[in-house]
Structures are given as C-alpha cells and as structure tokens.
A protein has these predicted regions:
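The feature represents the first ordered module of a protein
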Residues: 65-99
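Ampiphathic alpha-helical segments that act as solvent-exposed interaction surfaces
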Residues: 100-112, 133-164
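A short beta-strand motif that forms the metal-chelation/ATP-contact edge
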Residues: 62-63, 126-129
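A generic structural motif
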Residues: 90-94, 131-137
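Generic alpha-helical secondary structure signal
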Residues: 25-28, 32, 96-100, 139
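Charge-rich, low-complexity N-terminal segments
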Residues: 1-72, 120
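Short, highly charged C-terminal tails/helix-capping segments
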Residues: 160-180
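Short, internal acidic amphipathic alpha-helical interface segments
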Residues: 85-126
Length: 180
C-alpha cells in the first residue's frame, strides 16, 4: 500500500540495505575510513586526548576525551558486518533512588537521537547506540561522538546526585577547587 511517502533516490546506495552483510573487502575499506575519520577528529577536537585500536582481532576503537563535568569519557566503537556499535560508560549502579534514576534516563531516551541509556554489567549505566554501515560517514561519526560526549557532560552530575547521597557535596567541593 502506498501511503504518500517518498524517499530521496540517493538515501542509500541502490545495492546496499541496512540488512546487508558486508564482505571482508568492504569491511576492510570501512575500517580504513574509520581510522582516517577518527584521526581527523583527534586533530580537530582539542578535548579528544587519544584514539586507539584494540590489540585483538576484532575491529574496535577507543576515543578518550577530557570533560568538564566528568573528568574523562571514553567511547568504544565496534565494527560488525552490518553496523557500527558504540557505547560509553556513564556511571556505576546507583546506591540509592535507583527507580528515580532509571526513570530519569528512560525519559531522557525520548530526547536522544542515535543513542540510548541502558543498564550494563553490575547494573552500571551506559549510553549506547549503533548505525548501519550503509549510513556511516565522517559527519555521522562526528555527530555520534558529539552526542555521547555532550549527553554525558550534561547529565553526569545530575544522575550522580540522584544515585549517591554524597554526590552533591562532592560536586560543590570539586567546583570550589576549580575556582581557586
């Protein structure tokens, strides 16, 4: 049934769909592109401290950034046959007000594009997402890095204050030592 929606003719290459498996040569090309794109991001963004690769066989990159609210944020990228997955650790499991904290991040998921909060190992809070390889380009990779970084920077202390009794006091102490 046609419902009147039309997509741009070039929104995806004619031979490529989200469900396509990329062969070894295509993955090698994408791997090289990601290396190049992350290298350029490293030189153009002062807060990116390091871009590293996994020592193992998997296609995995680490982007470490200095923050203002959270001292460091590291984003892990993992290349699969269909998608590039990404995640960053936000905070450990809450010691108190877990229900309120989980509600806060679930409600925040509604406002995020290309990422979502999730619960990981030991109930820690992560920010995760994935993008189809057919849609991956340098602009999208930069958007992903910016989205994860800015979301962590914006919500790190508010989430800690919900989940930890001493967080507000620590934040005040931290801010007072920065102004001295």
């Amino acid at each position: 049934m046609y419902i009147g929606l039309s997509w741009p003719a070039n929104w995806l290459p004619a031979h490529s769909f989200v469900s396509d498996l990329f062969d070894d040569s295509a993955l090698a090309r994408i791997e090289r592109q990601i290396d190049e794109w992350l290298g350029r991001a490293r030189t153009s963004h002062a807060n990116i401290l390091a871009v590293d690769r996994s020592e193992e066989d998997e296609f995995r990159w680490y982007v470490r950034m200095a923050g203002e609210e959270k001292d460091f944020t590291t984003i892990w990228f993992t290349l699969g046959q269909r998608t590039l997955r990404y995640e960053t650790y936000v905070m450990p499991a809450p010691e108190q007000n877990a229900e309120k904290l989980y509600e806060t991040v679930l409600r925040r998921n509604e406002k995020l594009v290309g990422a979502h909060f999730s619960i990981g190992l030991e109930d820690a809070i992560y920010l995760r997402g994935e993008i189809g390889l057919a849609a991956l380009n340098e602009v999208e990779l930069d958007r992903i890095i910016g989205t994860l970084y800015s979301t962590v920077e914006q919500l790190f202390w508010p989430l800690l204050e919900i989940g930890y009794a001493k967080a507000a006091m620590l934040r005040t102490q931290r801010n007072s030592t920065r102004t001295v």
